[in-house]
């Protein structure tokens, strides 16, 4: 008979690890599947810097003991601001050592419904029963490939999530498609790696975030000495003043009347933008704005021919698609068809209720798939606290339960340490 666990978490990124921390602190039995921070480590470009502020980059734990500051102290090394990708990955892996030292690195190949819960099949053939399943596997399957690039081989056109080391493009001509942080930072990294780069942006202009750009007003407003800073900028600081507070409080954001208005507010909060500290690194990179790729064709030897909406042609060695992600949970390969048939969805997103529970009792979704129901905060690390607290509360107190009795564990949870106790070293 297959082993039974109260809660299975699929995914060991920020959302999965934060949820494990909160559930274990609540005494709920949990089993976490996945490799800690795998997407961040393998599918984000080397050399990347986090755009989010320091206070918006902590992975949430119940006692606020496992912050970036705590990681700095435990590792005896300072973490630069902005936070480099490799340091954030190391922080997340350290966080995982504290809250999920028993992390199960096996991949989940399939999740099927059962009468009192779910059956999970691992890639190595093991069968595990779980009362609840938390899907926290991130956005990797949702990489958006624009229609002109359909059928183009990955050697000629790839998504930013498919290329972690830009040094392979040294000496080659690369067109970066997009106008947000991913596109602009990728262009800077490519240029610094020795590539000949052009950025092609559909929008008429690039929206620059002034963080780090040298703006004295911006620095003064964000200074900890500014007495009105808490009134202007919540810790997450997503979107312009005013809207940023709605985004920071999903319970308020979801009260915005009509889905259409909420959608406009969300798009305004997370519109494509680049950090101000990127501008000096792009001085020698040509940026063509107000132009879209309308056709792409392999040819000219091993090169790619791009037809642009302004009537011009580019022939490049590679097109790097910084074109974002389009959530569609049907693209999670492990969800069985019978689960998907019972899943109420809105444009690819699961419709979620209290505790981030879907229309399939006991099946929860975290991260970007929760953004339709709880707002754009769920797309960022800053949302881990709200999500993990809400899910842990619902599971502990049986809000919209699955019918499977969630049992409290008999042993103490992994050390969720207080500041005066010794942390596991990185």
Q: How would you name each of these model-derived features?
A:
Residues 43, 57, 97, 211, ...:
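Enriched - but not universal
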Residues 1, 396-426:
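Intrinsic disorder/low-complexity segments
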Residues 2-37, 80-181, 185-398, 426:
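Flavin (primarily FAD) cofactor-binding/catalytic cores of flavoenzymes
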Residues 42-75, 234-255:
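Flavin (FAD/FMN) cofactor-binding and adjacent substrate-gating region
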Residues 21, 27, 53-54, 63, ...:
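Generic low-complexity, intrinsically disordered sequence content enriched
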